[in-house]
Swiss-Prot record:
Keywords: Cytoplasm, Elongation factor, Protein biosynthesis. Residues 76-79 are annotated as: Involved in Mg(2+) ion dislocation from EF-Tu. CDD domains: UBA_EF-Ts. Gene3D superfamilies: 1.10.286.20, DNA helicase RuvA subunit, C-terminal domain, Elongation factor Ts, dimerisation domain. The keyword Cell inner membrane does not apply. It comes from Rhodococcus erythropolis (strain PR4 / NBRC 100887). The gene is tsf. This is Elongation factor Ts. Associates with the EF-Tu.GDP complex and induces the exchange of GDP to GTP. It remains bound to the aminoacyl-tRNA.EF-Tu.GTP complex up to the GTP hydrolysis stage on the ribosome.
């Protein structure tokens, strides 16, 4: 008896882009363990693993002010570019910038015109005729850099990056904003490789090894091949190890070092994408 369901097969197909039989076989080989099945399909060369999971399903905008960034969602792009919706987002982020909420619940509890933001959202939702939802908030101290990106000229920003850094002067501010643009474009997840969880590195190393073996690489060449592929993974997900989008001859770290900037932390919001 199969230890997986048709829903598991459907989900695996949507996530990996693999064929039905490949997904069934992967689930069977993994004894129904979904994560192991995904890993097996990656090793076998399945394309776009994880990328489909990032597809956005909601509309809305990202807005930032004075070290605070929020994402507020709606159902359609028609509402996303509605003046009242944009005004509401601006009013909420202004309150958030003053209150510096630690999390989403704290943001919703702040007051705007004598009402909690949660209540204001509900009232505006009824007025506009679509479900509105505050989905994320980030609040940083110290010097910050912000970059907001529009997917379309007629829509408000749908991608936002907030970076907290140390450094002084215009050169430092410019370098930090460049790093924010970098995160918006290439979706780094960590500042340095030391921040990457050990289990993720181990998984990537395992995938690199199994893929190399499946490709028939000579045994004596495996250590170098594995190390190269793991380093490639780090360049994909670690901000300071990426080649700069503004100067491909330099790493982001080199540009930041030249400006005397150290990135403390960052967050990237994309409308509709999971946190």
């Amino acid at each position: 008896m199969a230890n997986y369901t048709a829903a598991d097969v459907k989900r695996l197909r949507e996530l990996t882009g693999s064929g039905m039989m490949a997904c069934k076989n992967a689930l069977a080989d993994a004894d129904g363990d979904f994560d192991k099945a995904v890993e097996q399909l990656r090793i076998k060369g399945a394309k776009d693993v994880g990328k489909r999971a990032e597809r956005t399903t909601a509309e809305g905008l990202v807005v930032a002010k004075d070290g605070v960034m929020i994402e507020i969602n709606c159902e359609t792009d028609f509402v996303a570019k509605n003046d009242e919706f944009i005004k509401l987002a601006d009013e909420i982020v202004t309150v958030a910038a003053a209150g510096k909420p630690a999390d989403l619940d704290a943001l919703k509890a702040l007051e705007l015109d004598g009402k909690t933001i949660d209540t204001v959202i509900a009232e505006q939702s009824a007025k506009i005729g679509e479900k509105l939802e505050l989905s994320r908030v980030a609040s940083f101290d110290g010097p910050v850099a912000v970059y907001l990106h529009k997917r379309s000229s007629d829509l408000p920003p749908a991608v936002g990056v907030l970076i907290e850094y140390t450094g002084e002067g215009d050169a430092a501010a410019e370098a930090a904003r460049g790093a924010a643009m970098q995160v918006a474009a290439l979706k780094a997840k960590y500042v340095t490789r030391d921040e990457v969880p050990a289990e993720i590195v181990a998984s990537e190393r395992h995938i690199a090894e199994e893929t190399a073996r499946a490709e028939g690489k000579p045994e004596q060449a495996l250590p170098k091949i594995i190390e190269g592929r793991v380093n490639g993974f780090f360049k994909d997900v670690v901000l300071t190890e990426q080649s700069s989008v503004t100067d491909s001859k330099k790493t982001v770290k080199a540009i930041l070092d030249e400006a005397g900037v150290t990135i403390k932390r960052f967050v990237r919001f994309e409308v509709g994408a999971s946190a």
